Amino acid sequence: MNQERLYKVLLGPHVSEKATLLAEINNQVVFRVAADAKKPEIKKAVEALFDVKVESVQVVNIKGKTKRTARGMGKRNDIRKAYIRLASGQSIDFVDVE
């Protein structure tokens, strides 16, 4: 996988109450990922960019909600999230990332 693809796979961290709880209890982090990203690609991207060891990757597709607008019905974008379990003793500090 080339360097450019590594940066396109991970779109950014997903911050929510559930993600924070998982980070504290299960040593998991949650990322928003590209719609066409596969589990092995996501694992390689996280290991290369953050220099950590990944134990497992679970992916979920979330369909965008249908919303009513002034011009009729609209739809929010679909998103894909990856739940990444890190090896014990590993962590990702989002503040110190280059």
From Swiss-Prot:
InterPro entries, sorted: Nucleotide-bd_a/b_plait_sf, Ribosomal_uL23-like, Ribosomal_uL23/eL15/eS24_sf, Ribosomal_uL23_CS
Subunit structure: Part of the 50S ribosomal subunit. Contacts protein L29, and trigger factor when it is bound to the ribosome.
GO biological process, one term: translation
NCBIfam families referenced in this protein's UniProt entry, alphabetically: PRK05738.1-3, PRK05738.2-4
Gene that encodes the chain: rplW
Keyword annotations of the record: Ribonucleoprotein, Ribosomal protein, RNA-binding, rRNA-binding
GO MF assignments: rRNA binding; structural constituent of ribosome
Organism for this UniProt entry: Hahella chejuensis (strain KCTC 2396)
Listed HAMAP family: Ribosomal_uL23_B
Disulfide bonds: none
Family as reported in the entry's similarity comment: Belongs to the universal ribosomal protein uL23 family.
GO CC terms: ribonucleoprotein complex; ribosome
Role of this protein: One of the early assembly proteins it binds 23S rRNA. One of the proteins that surrounds the polypeptide exit tunnel on the outside of the ribosome. Forms the main docking site for trigger factor binding to the ribosome.
Signal peptide, first to last residue: none
Protein name as catalogued: Large ribosomal subunit protein uL23
Any matching Pfam family: Ribosomal_L23
